């Protein structure tokens, strides 16, 4: 089964762009900022595993 998750949003409500697909240190840091431990770059946007619908932009 696919792991649930979401695209985190910044304070302006935008997704975080990324260029290095897969394991991506920038995305890991973004995901930790949003309170989850792991994420990666997918389709040029940071994706965070187990992130709820991201209503609280940071």
Curated annotation (Swiss-Prot):
Signal peptide positions on this chain: none
Pfam families, per database record: Toxin_3
Gene Ontology molecular function: sodium channel inhibitor activity; toxin activity
Residue ranges that the Swiss-Prot or TrEMBL entry lists as coiled coil: none
PROSITE patterns noted in UniProt: LCN_CSAB
GO CC term, one of those recorded: extracellular region
Location in or out of the cell: Secreted
Domain LCN-type CS-alpha/beta: 3-58
Tissue: Expressed by the venom gland.
Domain of life where this protein originates: Eukaryota
Assigned keywords, A-Z: Disulfide bond, Ion channel impairing toxin, Neurotoxin, Secreted, Toxin, Voltage-gated sodium channel impairing toxin
Disulfide bonds: 18-41, 27-46, 31-48
InterPro entries tied to this protein: LCN-type_CS_alpha_beta_dom, Scorpion_toxin-like_sf, Scorpion_toxinL/defensin
Principal cellular location given in the protein's record: secreted
Function as written in the Swiss-Prot or TrEMBL entry: Beta toxins bind voltage-independently at site-4 of sodium channels (Nav) and shift the voltage of activation toward more negative potentials thereby affecting sodium channel activation and promoting spontaneous and repetitive firing. Does not produce effect when administered to blowfly and cabbage looper larvae. In mice, does not produce convulsions, tremors, increased ventilation nor death.
Similarity comment: family membership: Belongs to the long (3 C-C) scorpion toxin superfamily. Sodium channel inhibitor family. Beta subfamily.
Domain commentary: Has the structural arrangement of an alpha-helix connected to antiparallel beta-sheets by disulfide bonds (CS-alpha/beta).
Protein name: Ikitoxin
